[in-house]
Amino acid sequence: MTYELHFKEEALAEWRRLDGSLREQFKKKLIERLAQPRVLSAKLSGHPDRYKIKLRSAGYRLVYEVRDGELIVVVVAVGRRDRNLVYQVAGRR
């Protein structure tokens, strides 16, 4: 079963500010994750149902939340990994 993709309002604004090539890379990975969103190696510790997608070469991260009851994946935050800022922002949302 495939999940639907949703964005938190703040995350959508961050998404729109991304360079087109970064968006395409994330989009490709998100399509894979909609089919299988719970990837154990990508689970965020201390945050139930939250996972990350990493673009190592660019240093960007995308944090998303899986809601099984509604069959949706919600993008919580998108940003550079610098000093784990994207993870801190996601923790506040």
Language model region names:
Residues 1-6, 10-13, 17, 24, ...:
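Enriched for short, Lys/Arg-rich terminal
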Residues 18-22, 43-46:
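Short, mixed-charge, low-aromatic patches
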Residues 21-35:
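Compact soluble domain cores
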Residues 31-56:
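A short, surface-exposed loop/turn module that caps and links secondary-structure elements
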